[in-house]
Curated annotation (Swiss-Prot):
UniProt entry keywords in alphabetical sequence: Cytoplasm, Lipopolysaccharide biosynthesis, Nucleotidyltransferase, Transferase
InterPro entries: Cytidylyl_trans, KdsB, Nucleotide-diphossugar_trans
Localization per Swiss-Prot or TrEMBL: Cytoplasm
Annotated GO CC locations: cytosol
An example molecular function term from Gene Ontology annotations: 3-deoxy-manno-octulosonate cytidylyltransferase activity
The protein's name: 3-deoxy-manno-octulosonate cytidylyltransferase
Gene (UniProt): kdsB
Organism listed in the record: Anaeromyxobacter dehalogenans (strain 2CP-C)
EC number: 2.7.7.38
PANTHER family, per the entry: 3-DEOXY-MANNO-OCTULOSONATE CYTIDYLYLTRANSFERASE (PTHR42866), 3-DEOXY-MANNO-OCTULOSONATE CYTIDYLYLTRANSFERASE, MITOCHONDRIAL (PTHR42866:SF2)
Major location category of this protein: cytoplasm
Catalytic activity: 3-deoxy-alpha-D-manno-oct-2-ulosonate + CTP = CMP-3-deoxy-beta-D-manno-octulosonate + diphosphate
Pathway: Nucleotide-sugar biosynthesis; CMP-3-deoxy-D-manno-octulosonate biosynthesis; CMP-3-deoxy-D-manno-octulosonate from 3-deoxy-D-manno-octulosonate and CTP: step 1/1; Bacterial outer membrane biogenesis; lipopolysaccharide biosynthesis
Lineage of producing organism: Bacteria, Pseudomonadati, Myxococcota, Myxococcia, Myxococcales
Length: 242
């Protein structure tokens, strides 16, 4: 079995919701919920939060989790890569799990880890599109080859369907990633691509440079906390047993 680390990048100064990782959610910091759910996933050897903020480090450790202090980073993936270098033993598979997903399902983490079987160097998840989501730019769409590797990710409705209506070929991307430790270093060393800049989608960097991304199915819809209103929704969902 390969050594697997789930690393959760977190920063304090989010523009829309400063201090978000430490926001109270059912009596504990939001980031603690992400850690606890990741710890429930089968096949995970270590879960760690990667942050450049001492307040987050203290909160995670007070909740019984592991936190790694990093330097300033351009992206969450850069922060994950730095944290992975500091782990001992060095993980063979690194899962990049967003720190604003307190309702993450352990099965989704297991699915992206499972997608790394068979020699994949990078993997992510996708789910069926709900009605009306194809046209929404907030929902990232992905289309894949017959092999299951990604052809393209876009905020636009892809593919265009000449017959009209919504295409059954596109799925909604769920932003959880797994990398081999070696490819994580390769990825973070790549120059940002033009398509990545146009779409504001970091994963396009791999495709632009000719690397494959395996895409596995999940039933998890994804629920990131971007605003205080999102936090209220999460509180209601947790109270209802989510």
């Amino acid at each position: 079995m390969r050594h697997v680390a789930v690393i959760i990048p977190a920063r304090y100064g989010a523009t829309r919701f400063p201090g978000k990782p430490l926001a109270d959610l059912a009596g504990k910091p939001l980031i603690a919920h992400v850690v606890e759910r990741a710890q429930r996933a089968r096949g995970v050897d270590v879960v760690a939060v990667a942050t450049d903020d001492d307040r987050i480090v203290r909160a995670v450790r007070a909740a019984g989790g592991e936190a790694i202090l990093t330097g300033p980073a351009a992206t969450g993936t850069d922060r994950v890569a730095e944290a992975a270098r500091k782990l001992a033993p060095r993980p063979e598979i690194v899962v990049n799990l967003q720190g604003d997903e307190p309702l993450i399902e352990p099965e989704a983490i297991e699915a992206v880890i499972g997608a790394m079987a068979g020699g994949a160097r990078m993997a992510t998840l996708a789910r069926p599109l709900a009605e009306g989501e194809l046209e929404r730019t907030q929902v990232v769409k992905v289309v894949t080859r017959a092999s299951g590797d990604a052809l393209y990710f876009s905020r636009a409705p892809i593919p265009h369907r000449r017959a009209g209506g919504e295409s059954p070929l596109a799925r909604a991307h769920v932003g959880i990633y797994a990398f081999t430790a070696e490819f994580l270093e390769t990825f973070t060393a790549l120059a940002p691509g033009r398509l990545e800049g146009e779409e504001a989608l970091e994963q396009l960097r791999a495709l632009e440079h000719g690397y494959d991304i395996r895409v596995a199915d999940t039933g998890y819809r994804g629920f990131g906390i971007d605003t205080p209103d999102d936090l209220e929704r999460a509180r209601a969902l947790l109270a209802a047993g989510a």
